[in-house]
Amino acid sequence: MMNGMRVSFLNRFLRMTAVVLAAAFAFLLAGCGGSSTSTSFTWFVDNIPANLDPQVATKAEDVIACENLYGGLVRRNASGELVPDLCERWEISSDGLTYTFYLKSGLTYTGTKGAATDYAITAEDFVYAFRRVFDPQTASPYAVEFSAIQNSAAVLDGTADPGTLGVSAIGELTLVFRLSERDDTFLSKLTLPGAMPCDEAFFESTRGTYGLSSASTLSSGSFYIYNWTASGLFLRRSAASPLVNNLRLVQNTSNTDKSAAQLIADEKCSAALDDTAEATSLQSVEYSDTTWALLFNASEVSVFAVASLRQALAGIAL
């Protein structure tokens, strides 16, 4: 029996071998304690990431990088549950139309090679990020995901001022979303790259190159950019951890005709993207059009028969 989990998101077809799932499962176990030895994870991708602007990233390699570079309001834990990330807690009104988040104090962005910065992460950064999502000039693919936000359609088509968008800051650490209609998936959508914070002053300082180079990218997540060259994107974890500490996204240039399964067997990478749809004994994660799905063998004898594990792997960030 196969069990699929689907969430609207990407707009192109990809296929990633399930070795990713096996590796993620191993990292979950490692997270329970034990060795602090540095662990590396290597992705073979079609192209080196080129755009790390989370509000516009859509290509697979860019999204993979953004999901690890940026932290948002919420994340999924090892049990697949939504838990606070950059916020301490949140409240939802009884009618489901108002979401209030209370951010952690003292958070700052991280620069290239782990350099400390003076850019504090505040509620205004999320306000600015969502204004960018609904700025017609941004052409963000995430606007459709957050269409329930009050006045979003009018702001997007240019008939309303961005200041009327239903996202506001009350002081530095309180963020409020007002929806025009109930969206029971709203919290889950806040894990998408488009919902990641963006410091307006830093964005303006990049003069149109935000997310296009190491110098024009700041991290708010678990990893920061260590190096970004024609050879690949190399990320390191901000704090020592028994989980993955080094994440490498490199282009497969040795033999583009190889399937993902062959790449993993021959090139010793941790994961690879494949659009051949070739039959394999490995499980796969599929991304198609505006829907992506994780497919698991959920038979009684499979480790993936445990629903909580499937849920965790559906939302895990390395």
Language model features with spans:
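Ligand-site clamp/hinge motif
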Residues: 204, 231-279
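Short, well-ordered beta-strand elements
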Residues: 38-50, 98-102, 126-129, 175-176, ...
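Alpha-helical secondary-structure segments
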Residues: 123-128, 172-176, 246, 266, ...
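Surface-exposed ligand-recognition segments of extracellular binding domains, strongest
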Residues: 80-108, 139-201
